[in-house]
């Protein structure tokens, strides 16, 4: 559910997957004598991780664990791959198998022999991400371990054997033939071995051997388009530079908000050996550094049309709309920036609460019995409410069980975006899936809104950094009941920086006073019947400031209640640039000249009556760049005189401070 194209992160995430798929096959090994099979099995180990406890996770019903195969159910470890011995305390596996342990919620990878003995990994001696191999040593290696010796390069159609663990059920040997070689993807610097011997999940990192039990390669992955598997020739391991770690990749770097891409390459080297924990720190640091550099450069290379720069931004800089559910801004055709909110799902909660959400955006309207201070400070409560709407399930055999709670967040931080909006970033652990569910939320007077995503644990930090970058491209307005607004305004440190320049006085059923550097407005009972349940929305928008674009209040809407049509609205209209569509030009001319519907004449539609005007007299003074629209809406069909009186009162209550 990462709401962006994979690019560099996608390349990194590949390292977390066991790349082999199941190929139905019979376990044959018919050409291997018993002694050779015994030696191969003695030299081959499972790569395992200790399973984590569920911790604070709760479910809607007991887990049907009996649906899990017995061996997997009772095993304290999960099998993630295979390794084999090539020398005294020297073991080889696939690089992507080792990478699965990076920042994992499972225990660090270890090797397990056929007797069930588990040997912690001590050091990483060699590592190559592109060639996909790693050489390891163990803390307390087994005595007199069997070692596989390299054999000659196989001839076409030679019988070969793929060796690997069967997901905790022991080492399995499958036969096939060597079919061909395939050049590596970048420059064709070496050839992978391709073979037909079937391989299953868990075989990654295992040995490919000939009928004499001699080592030919490291089993890596299945061909995406045919029933063939790939292995790295063992010569690539044996001739690799000792004491070196190498992370190299070629990938397309993209942003989900723009139709831009660059092909990036990197080739980073670091010294080995390193103890396993230090290796992971170094490995993640290299990948995160490259990721940060690539996206920084991608934005810099396209700065001329990245919002808010360029003519394509003007449409959005003249857009004011209600958006309590956040919308991601994105660049459409011809570099025009727009907000196109995806269709959302709405789930009702108890006590008038609800959750509105898309695949990556969320709006929580807190239940009446949940006060805002508690919501912002209690991460368990925040996620529990979200999980009443967002379906998170745990697969158990052929069944799946819904998660009802993830407990408290494992990490919490705050982040202020370029527009001064203070986001709360919280990450909840999903131990069984080795994943994190991360919410970047902006506290609002009704609860919170923001974005969310789910990511493998090892890449949660890097993914969060990317999501922070995208917060600058979130379009959102803020609304809530007057009672909630009173609570929200007392909670310091959570409000966006722009609130320092605003004066908002909410006096329950008495009046609402709003003042900014741009306009003032007062709403009193003579204009609108007010109560603690009345709704006020501040329509924030991106506006041209003195020397930069700012996020500021561009309008205010107040309604008698959440389901009432009786309301007043004041909004800002800036003179459009000449290249904006005719609709912008036409609305500006009508507002400047007070043409219909801004001529203080009633119009009825959809069971309501509207009347509107502007803060300027007809024609207005020359050189005016900003005008404010004023509208009164009433339920049913209302007479002109009564509506005009309300509009006059609103006009006297509004003062435009900018021109």
Question: Which positions does each model-derived feature cover?
Answer:
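N-terminal activation segment of mature serine protease catalytic domains
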Residues: 27-84, 91-94, 254-322
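Active-site region of chymotrypsin-like
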Residues: 43, 60-75, 118, 137-147, ...
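Catalytic-histidine neighborhood of serine endopeptidases
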Residues: 74-141, 155-156, 361-374
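Short glycine/Trp-rich loop-beta-loop segment that forms part of the substrate-binding cleft
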Residues: 149-171
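Signature of long, low-cysteine stretches enriched in small and polar/charged residues
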Residues: 385-449, 567-641, 658-659
């Amino acid at each position: 559910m990462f709401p962006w194209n994979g690019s560099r992160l996608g390349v990194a995430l590949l390292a977390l997957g066991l790349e082999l798929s199941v190929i139905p096959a019979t376990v044959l090994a018919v050409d291997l004598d018993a002694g050779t099979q015994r030696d191969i099995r003695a030299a081959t180990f499972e790569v395992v991780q200790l399973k984590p406890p569920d911790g604070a996770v709760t479910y809607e019903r007991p887990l049907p664990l009996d649906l899990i195969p017995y061996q997997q159910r009772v095993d304290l470890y999960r099998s993630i791959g295979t390794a084999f011995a090539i020398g005294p305390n020297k073991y080889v596996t696939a690089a992507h198998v080792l990478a699965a342990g990076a920042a994992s919620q499972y225990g660090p990878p270890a090797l397990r022999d056929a007797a069930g003995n588990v040997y912690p990994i001590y050091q990483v001696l060699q590592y190559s991400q592109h060639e996909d191999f790693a050489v390891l040593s163990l803390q307390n290696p087994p005595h007199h371990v069997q070692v596989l010796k390299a054999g000659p390069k196989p001839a076409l159609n030679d019988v070969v054997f793929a060796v690997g663990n069967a997901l905790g059920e022991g080492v399995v040997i499958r036969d096939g033939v060597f079919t061909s070689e395939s050049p590596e993807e970048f420059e064709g610097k070496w050839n992978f071995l391709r073979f037909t011997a079937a391989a299953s999940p868990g075989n990654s990192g295992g040995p490919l051997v000939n009928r004499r039990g001699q080592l030919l390669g490291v089993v890596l992955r299945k061909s995406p388009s045919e029933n063939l598997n790939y292995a790295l020739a063992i010569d690539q391991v044996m001739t690799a530079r000792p004491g070196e770690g190498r992370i190299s990749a070629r990938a397309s770097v993209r942003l989900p908000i723009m139709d831009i891409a660059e092909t990036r390459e990197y080739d980073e080297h670091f010294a080995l050996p390193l103890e396993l924990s230090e290796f992971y720190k170094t490995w993640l640091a290299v990948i995160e550094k490259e990721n940060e550099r690539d996206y920084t450069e991608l934005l810099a290379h396209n700065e001329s049309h990245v919002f808010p720069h360029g003519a394509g931004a003007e449409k959005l800089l003249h857009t004011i709309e209600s958006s309590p559910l956040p919308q991601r801004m994105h660049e459409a055709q011809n570099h025009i920036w727009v907000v196109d909110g995806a269709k959302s799902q709405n789930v009702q909660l108890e006590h008038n609460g609800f959750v509105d959400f898309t695949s990556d955006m969320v709006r929580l309207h807190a239940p009446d019995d949940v006060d805002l201070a508690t919501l912002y400070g209690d991460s368990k409560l925040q996620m529990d409410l979200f999980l009443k709407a967002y379906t998170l399930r745990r697969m158990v055999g052929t069944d799946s069980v819904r998660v009802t709670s993830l407990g408290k967040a494992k990490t919490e931080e705050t982040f202020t975006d370029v527009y001064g909006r203070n986001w709360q970033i919280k990450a909840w652990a999903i131990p069984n899936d080795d994943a994190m569910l991360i919410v970047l939320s902006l506290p609002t007077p009704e609860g919170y809104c923001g974005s969310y995503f789910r990511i493998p644990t090892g890449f949660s930090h890097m993914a969060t950094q990317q999501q922070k970058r995208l917060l600058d491209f979130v379009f959102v307005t803020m609304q809530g009941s007057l009672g909630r607004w009173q609570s929200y305004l007392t909670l310091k440190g959570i409000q966006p920086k722009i609130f320092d320049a605003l004066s908002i006085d909410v006096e329950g059923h008495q009046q609402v006073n709003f003042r900014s550097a741009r306009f003032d407005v007062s709403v009193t009972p003579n204009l609108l019947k007010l109560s603690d349940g009345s709704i006020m929305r501040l329509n924030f928008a991106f506006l041209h400031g003195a020397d930069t674009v700012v996020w500021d209040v561009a309008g205010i809407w107040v309604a008698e209640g959440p389901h009432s049509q009786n309301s007043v609205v004041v909004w800002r209209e800036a003179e459009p640039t000449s290249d904006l569509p005719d609709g912008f030009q036409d609305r500006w001319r009508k507002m400047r000249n007070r043409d219909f519907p801004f001529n203080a004449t009633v119009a009825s539609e959809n069971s309501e009556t509207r009347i509107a005007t502007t803060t300027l007299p007809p024609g207005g003074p020359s050189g005016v760049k900003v005008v404010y629209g004023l509208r009164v809406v009433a339920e049913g069909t209302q007479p002109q005189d009564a509506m005009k009186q309300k509009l006059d009162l609103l006009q006297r209550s509004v003062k435009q401070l900018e021109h």
